């Protein structure tokens, strides 16, 4: 699959039937390592690969409380959650957030290429970041905060090219 095929086939997958193999997970992580980071400050981002079902369950529960929805399942019973954390202190721009989002998108596109299900996770990550006890369980390096993440795993869903409507995002041209 070429890059544009992966981009046009990408979708949020929320149904999983197993964990990625070690080789698949390493490929997904390699895509993260290939992501651009502002001013090449790679020491300002950190990945946490969580496959501990108990911890994923705690994050899911924190999100239920955060959204005041006891029926919510924002982690979708995923076997793996990859959290991207960053150093936010001392910044007054959006570079740390952009770095993390770019890292996640690279991992998602690699997952598409591998036929793995993947989905950006924002809400549960926000809930996690507001829960000091859960953040402590992550053993993040000093000064790092959870920013965004993705879930990934085996799926029976198939990626096929989607019709991408032009004009979906308002676009202005300045000549």
Across the structure, where does each feature detected by a protein language model lie?
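Short, charged/polar surface micro-motifs in flexible loops or helix N-caps
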Residues: 52-57, 88-90, 156
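Solvent-exposed alpha-helices and their adjacent loops that cap or buttress functional pockets
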Residues: 39-42, 73-76, 138-144, 163-165
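Short, surface-exposed loop/helix-turn segments at secondary-structure junctions
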Residues: 60-64, 132-137
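C-terminal helix-cap and adjacent tail motif
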Residues: 3-12, 17, 21, 140, ...
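Small-aliphatic-rich amphipathic alpha-helix that forms the alpha element of a beta-alpha
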Residues: 32, 82, 88-134
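Generic beta-strand structural signal
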Residues: 80, 114, 146-148
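N-terminal amphipathic, basic helical "cap/leader" segment at the start of enzyme domains
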Residues: 1-80, 174-175
